[in-house]
C-alpha cells in the first residue's frame, strides 16, 4: 500500500508459491501500520503456516498480557477497511511524490551519464537506493556530513550494516521539506562527484 502512483504493480502472493512448492513452513510474513498511521504506534501483523503460527502463539502468550486494545480500536476506527487504508495512503503519496521527484531531478541532471553511480527510481516505499563507485559510500557520507547534510549510515541496507563493496547509500527523502531536499541533493551530488574524482586521481 506504500505506493507513490495510481494503479501500482500488483505483487505476487509469496504464500501461494510456498503452498505450490511445499515450503510454507519456511516463510514468516510481517507487516504493520507503523508507517501508515504513526511510528511505533501501529498494529502489527503476522502471517505464516499454522505450525509457525502456533509456535508464535505459545511464546506471545507468556510475553505479554495482551495487545493494546485501545490502540487497536483507534486504528480500526480511523482506517475502517482496505478502502480506508488506500485512501489514506493516497494522501501519503501526495506528500511524498514531490520529494522523490526532487531526488530524481538532481540525480538525473547532475550524475546521469558520468559513470559515478546508479540509483533506483522507486514507485513506492520510502527510500532511493544509490550505488556509488565501489569504496566510496562512507567517503560520500563523510563529505556530505561536513557540508551539513546528514545521510543514512553507509551499509544500512546490509546485514550488520556491512556493505562489502562500500558503495550503497540509502537516501531517505520522506522527512525533509522539498525545499530542504533541494539544498541537500545539491550537496549530495557534489559530494558524489568530488569523491569519484579524488578516487580516480
Regions found by a protein language model. Name each.
Residues 90-104, 116-131:
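Conserved glycine-rich beta-strand-loop-beta hairpin in the small C-terminal domain of fold type I
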Residues 150:
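Residue-level detector of anion-binding/catalytic polar loops
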Residues 1-15:
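Conserved PLP phosphate-binding loop immediately N-terminal to the Schiff-base lysine helix
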Residues 16-23, 109-111:
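Short, conserved catalytic or adaptor-binding loops enriched in Gly and charged residues
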Residues 19-97:
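Conserved core segment of the aminotransferase class I/II
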Residues 133-137, 176-178:
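Helix N-cap motif at beta-to-alpha junctions
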Residues 23, 146, 161-201:
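PLP-dependent enzyme catalytic core of the Aspartate aminotransferase-like
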Residues 31, 45-47, 120-121, 127-131, ...:
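Short beta-strand segments
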